[in-house]
Design a protein with these regions (language model features):
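Substrate-recognition element of Asp-dependent hydrolases with the DxDx(T/V) motif
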Residues: 6, 26-54, 84-89, 138-147
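Active-site glycine- and acidic-residue-rich loops that bind
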Residues: 117-125
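Catalytic-core regions built around general acid/base machinery
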Residues: 21-33, 128-135
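A short, structured active-site edge motif that brings together acidic residues
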Residues: 63-74, 108-110, 144
């Protein structure tokens, strides 16, 4: 089976609305027996949340193996590692990482700092992360999409 991959934000949907023509295009791809993989660099939603959103918008079942996000890659990366992780990000990110790994709220106990989306950073938080790095801690960052355009309503043609 051949596979095609597509981005989500701005390609399949804008905010919570399907982009006109997407459903018809995906039905056409299904007719040609193409497996569709949905890719995003957004780490603010768990893969299950994205799958549920797509199912509601597309009116079809979406398997989790069709979803590729930074969290999917993170889960695979951490699969056989046993390390304490300090999460500097949203509650959603902390909850997801806590479901797949050992999370600590004490950065000094961590072997890995994971930086995700967080609306505001303090200088103390930045200093603590730098100190952890200088003490040998691995630092990993998920995207901060500075180019994402937020549109309140999809453009209709």
């Amino acid at each position: 089976m051949n596979t095609i991959a597509t981005d989500l934000d701005g390609t399949i949907y804008l905010n919570n609305e399907i982009i006109p023509g997407v459903i018809e295009s995906l039905l056409d791809l299904d007719k040609h027996n193409l497996k569709i993989i949905f890719i995003t660099n957004n780490s603010s939603q768990a893969p299950m949340e994205i799958s549920n959103k797509l199912e509601k918008l597309l009116f079809k079942d979406i398997d989790l193996d069709q979803i590729v996000t930074p969290l999917v890659i993170l889960k695979q990366y951490l699969e056989n590692k046993n390390m304490m992780i300090y999460v500097h990000g949203s509650d959603n990110l902390s909850n997801f990482v806590n479901s797949i790994a050992n999370v600590t709220t004490n950065i000094d106990e961590s072997q890995m700092v994971l930086i995700g989306r967080k609306e505001k950073y303090t200088q103390l938080e930045v200093n603590n992360i730098m100190s952890a790095y200088q003490n040998g801690c691995n630092i990993y960052a998920l995207n901060k999409d500075l180019s994402l355009i937020h549109i309140s309503e999809p453009t209709r043609r």
